[in-house]
């Protein structure tokens, strides 16, 4: 009798989970993307009046911002470009351009390897989605800046200059995220030097 009851309950449970009320995957994805767009717009609206600031994290119930020097500064503009790519909302495009512009000064960064993902997440996606030629100059200047971190004797791009008393030539896996911009620069200019650095 125990086995019968166990199998009956298991059968009822499985029948209840059969999925007859499940939404198609496409619907679930569309809802998730619509929610992401709403949340991204809320963040962009909140930060639009904070000149030069970019969202960074949430700590102790408060949002924390950064300027463009933070190593992840290109990520939020990149998110805006991806959200724009999905829905083609003109408001998202406006914010993507605004927050991308906030990162432009990093094209001259030569003291760390982060310039690749500061710029390629933002300006790279902006160029890909809009064809805005002004973004090319930013990316090329950034690629030249990043290439200054390469040391031919070592064959690598140095990650940082700090802690020289601990590290001779620090290189971390994040460097891989910078290579795409260098490959783009070689393809765009026909100059193999960027590819060779990568």
Pin down the residues of each PLM region.
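Glycan-recognition and catalytic cores of secretory/periplasmic carbohydrate-active enzymes
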Residues: 21-198
């Amino acid at each position: 009798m125990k086995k019968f009851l166990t199998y009956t309950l298991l059968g009822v449970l499985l029948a209840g989970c059969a999925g007859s009320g499940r939404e198609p995957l496409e619907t679930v994805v569309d809802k998730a993307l619509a929610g992401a767009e709403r949340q991204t717009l809320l963040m962009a609206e909140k930060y639009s009046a904070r000149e030069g600031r970019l969202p960074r994290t949430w700590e102790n119930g408060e949002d924390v911002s950064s300027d463009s020097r933070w190593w992840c500064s290109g990520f939020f503009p990149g998110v805006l470009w991806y959200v724009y790519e999905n829905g083609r909302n003109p408001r998202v495009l406006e914010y993507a351009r605004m927050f991308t512009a906030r990162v432009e000064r990093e094209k001259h960064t030569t003291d760390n390897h982060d310039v690749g993902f500061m710029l390629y997440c933002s300006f790279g996606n902006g160029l890909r989605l809009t064809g805005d030629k002004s973004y090319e100059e930013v990316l090329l200047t950034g690629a030249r800046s990043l290439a200054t971190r390469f040391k031919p004797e070592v064959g690598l791009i140095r990650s940082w200059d700090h802690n020289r008393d601990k590290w001779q030539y620090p290189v971390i896996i994040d460097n891989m995220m910078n290579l795409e911009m260098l490959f783009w620069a070689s393809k765009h200019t026909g100059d193999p030097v960027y590819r060779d650095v990568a």
